[in-house]
Amino acid sequence: MSIRIIPQDELGSSEKRTADMIPPLLFPRLKNLYNRRAERLRELAENNPLGDYLRFAALIAHAQEVVLYDHPLEMDLTARIKEASAQGKPPLDIHVLPRDKHWQKLLMALIAELKPEMSGPALAVIENLEKASTQELEDMASALFASDFSSVSSDKAPFIWAALSLYWAQMANLIPGKARAEYGEQRQYCPVCGSMPVSSMVQIGTTQGLRYLHCNLCETEWHVVRVKCSNCEQSGKLHYWSLDDEQAAIKAESCDDCDTYLKILYQEKDPKIEAVADDLASLVLDARMEQEGYARSSINPFLFPGEGE
């Protein structure tokens, strides 16, 4: 199955009246998203060997919250949705959508917000980004979208991505359309922007017990059935790993068909669990999965592979 976004004027009457039994897509809910992430990162930093880095990530998340409301985006995406729907492509496809200068405006605003909080190497990094030319910044963004991580140092990537993520999340929040599940491929990528997930979440509330993958760029969540590999869609050779016990709130789902894994977070076991924060705070589990010979099928927006990784 794949997910396609349909323009409002192409929806059938039943689709306009009611949601699907299982919502295939949950557009980003930006109100307090970044503040909640920052709070969770600070909470997880206590008694965590990665505490300093989690607090650093919390500073970026808090800055995203401030910049989000200081620099709103106004954009009519109606034509873009129609074109993408006709082509069967993600409407905000990172590989083809022209980037507006708004994202660089967001980056400069993030740097201004973060400067008073930074020191040492981190301060030097954002000052270098502040001095970079428009083209240099665009080249770094293009490299990240192409997964050419050797072209962007791992200390610069989180700041560049934080601005790009804000821009894409703002656009995703403006999409005038509805998602429809259809037969197709590439469910492992975000149906809104084509980026990778950061982790998956088994939710509570109106989507109780359903698994949604969380986009590491536009913050959209999309449904993928449980007990199926989110990367290759096979189901015969799945295994579940945790550092605690079978009731752990965070597990890794590995697949022996493609030798990859993705973390599954369970809200029913910890209602405060957060897709980005808890993924970052559980890197010990990633180390274990690497020892077992599995490759990660996702990327955390605060932790990019460096050159040679």
Swiss-Prot record:
Gene3D superfamilies from the UniProt entry: FdhE-like domain
Subcellular localization: Cytoplasm
UniProt record, GO biological process: protein maturation
Alphabetized InterPro entries for the sequence: FdhE-like_sf, FdhE_C, FdhE_central, FdhE_N, Formate_DH_accessory
Domain of life: Bacteria
Pfam families found in the cross-reference section: FdhE_C (PF24860), FdhE_central (PF24859), FdhE_N (PF04216)
Entry GO CC: cytoplasm; cytosol
Principal cellular location given in the protein's record: cytoplasm
Keyword annotations of the record: Cytoplasm
GO molecular function: ferric iron binding; protein homodimerization activity
Keyword Cytoplasm: yes
Family per similarity comment: Belongs to the FdhE family.
Protein name according to UniProt: Protein FdhE
Source species of the chain: Escherichia coli (strain K12)
